């Protein structure tokens, strides 16, 4: 792969990663399709995808830095408060949201990696879309937690249980957690924010583990390509998160569910 071509591929995949990582549409499904169409597959491609996820994670940190620092007791000025009462989101909420998927992910890490194939991703796209529709149809008419700071520890833990569905490649971590939050009585907006905050430790841990296992596939020659992908993913993810949070104030997740079905059909057409 020529230098110019490899950098172009990196930029395209960075855009795809940044656009889809935090939307409930499955970044995995999109990366599989686009990577296949670009002829960028194999061990190096998998390592590249792990690295550019760090760019997406950095976008969340930049967006929610004040809230994230506040969770660990470091305060800069007045802390944000989004709720109807005096409650506050704590580090305990994040930890409870992490526990179920961390335990299952560590125990079944190799098994989960073996599930990364187009068939499983296609089915996960469909099932995840159905869950989004179910969440919109079955959520309480009046959310019990309108704001992020109204969330209970029980709601955080149950969202963590739903996050386990995202261990199924193609399901979408944000789709699973947001759907779970809505079914637990958390508003669409607050569930999305919690999903983003929960993504930081979850994705950093998973990425660190994957990088450790993929370290041998990294070469000095790949650094420019990986850097372009990382920066592109960061910039695009930053824009995507801001746009998404504004969008869900006006629309439901039904269009995202329909889009997932379209992507599932695309996976079928491309690979079968």
UniProtKB/Swiss-Prot annotation:
Documented EC number(s): 3.6.1.27
Molecular function (Gene Ontology), one example: undecaprenyl-diphosphatase activity
Catalyses which reaction(s): di-trans,octa-cis-undecaprenyl diphosphate + H2O = di-trans,octa-cis-undecaprenyl phosphate + phosphate + H(+)
Any one annotated GO CC term: plasma membrane
Enzyme class: hydrolase
Pfam hit, one: BacA
Chain ranges passing through the membrane: 4-24, 45-65, 89-109, 115-135, 152-174, 189-209, 225-245, 251-271
Topology versus the membrane: Multi-pass membrane protein
Keywords associated with the record: Antibiotic resistance, Cell inner membrane, Cell membrane, Cell shape, Cell wall biogenesis/degradation, Hydrolase, Membrane, Peptidoglycan synthesis, Transmembrane, Transmembrane helix
GO biological process: cell wall organization; peptidoglycan biosynthetic process; regulation of cell shape; response to antibiotic
Location relative to the cell: Cell inner membrane
Miscellaneous: Bacitracin is thought to be involved in the inhibition of peptidoglycan synthesis by sequestering undecaprenyl diphosphate, thereby reducing the pool of lipid carrier available.
Family statement drawn from the similarity comment of this UniProt entry: Belongs to the UppP family.
Name of this chain's protein: Undecaprenyl-diphosphatase
Source species: Citrobacter koseri (strain ATCC BAA-895 / CDC 4225-83 / SGSC4696)
